[in-house]
Amino acid sequence: MASENNKRKASEEALSPDSQLQSKKARTDSPEREPKSEGGPLGKPPLRIVPFPEKPAVLEERRGEIEFRVVNNDGSRDSFVVLTGLKCIFQKQLPKMPKDYIARLVYDRSHLSIAIVKHPLEVVGGITYRPFNSRRFAEIVFCAISSDQQVKGYGAHLMSHLKDYVKATSPIMHFLTYADNYAIGYFKKQGFTKEITLDKSIWMGYIKDYEGGTIMQCTMLPKIRYLEIGRMLLKQKEAVHAKIRAFSRSHIIHAPPKEWKNGACKIDPLSIPAIKQSGWSPDMDELARQPRHGPNYNQLLHLLNDMQNHSAAWPFTQPVNRDEVPDYYEVIKEPMDLSTMEEKHEKDMYPTPQDFIKDAMLIFDNCRRYNNENTPYAKSANKLEKFMWQQIRNIPEWSVST
């Protein structure tokens, strides 16, 4: 746990001149674009400006229907109202978290929050985080959007606001968070990764370790304004397409084959010059038609996710730490855990349910072999194994084969 000296004091950091402005609005007006040349290379169509499709969250902010406020427990009435709204959303959207624990951290003055606020002071979502300025990272503690507001792009826009605000007001360049299996997809889309590049000496002992959660990291780029990243990527895409068009012949319209004059008939694709020049072959077509995953992939994925989210899965989410349990690998010669199973599943290494069950049983048998039957570890193994078989029995085609 972090020492008191490392905590952000409301009077020193949260209310510093750089962050006194508690309401932060994005400059989301589209910058003027330079007019593009009407003409182009001979025989090439003129370049067209592709309009940038703004998300509903951006349009609502531009119209003043929502705003993004950075708040902490500074004693003001408005801040208390916003923090209370955030607390209620977190408690509703994160039911596995103790309510008193959520309230304690949201109102903690060492934490800051950025909230999406509708008028008058109606909170629809937000992020609570704890900054560690001297260590140049922040821990995202809670992140949630109201369940009836999750289709407008609020989550992505909120994260972009947070990144730009933190970069502008502090030396922080990294975020760390613990995500459950349902939140990993969201954080991946926001630039987070399971690969932790920050040295453990920087963050170990400073952030809360959640059982069953996956630690993820996001490192910000200093020259990027994240609220404009969508428009920036569109410009890059247009530039790449312009380069391609300078050498491409894909815009040329070819006359249909003469064989089609009297109706459709079967022809050899390689007899068409344009197809032959493209380098296409029948093998490529056959390869493209092959399924990406095996027939059991999706059902196994659901089963694995259900097992990872089970309350008894906490001892099995990651490989046993050799430093914490030195003799474990002397006793257990074939170690297995749920994260390793997830990696194997992503690589299609479970062609049949039996292959999946074999590794799962390895987890339970290893646990019971190393631990006494009265330990919490062995009891968790029994509970999770029982749950797994219950789920398998709900899939008729599996229950016959297994």
UniProtKB/Swiss-Prot annotation:
PROSITE patterns this protein is in? BROMODOMAIN_1 (PS00633), BROMODOMAIN_2 (PS50014), GNAT (PS51186)
Q: What happens when the gene is disrupted?
A: Leads to decreased N6-benzoyllysine levels and enzymatic activity of adhB. Decreases conidiation and seed colonization, increases sclerotia formation and aflatoxin production, and increases sensitivity to cell wall damage stress.
Under Enzyme Commission nomenclature, its number is 2.3.1.48, 2.3.1.-
Query: Per the record, GO CC terms?
Result: ADA complex; chromosome, centromeric region; cytosol; nucleus; SAGA complex; SLIK (SAGA-like) complex
Top enzyme class: transferase
**Could you tell me the superkingdom of the organism this chain comes from?**
Eukaryota
Region (Disordered) residue spans: 1-49
Q: Which family does it belong to?
A: Belongs to the acetyltransferase family. GCN5 subfamily.
Q: What does the domain comment read?
A: Both bromo and N-acetyltransferase domains are important in benzoyltransferase activity of gcnE.
Listed name of the protein: Histone acetyltransferase gcnE
Give the gene name.
gcnE
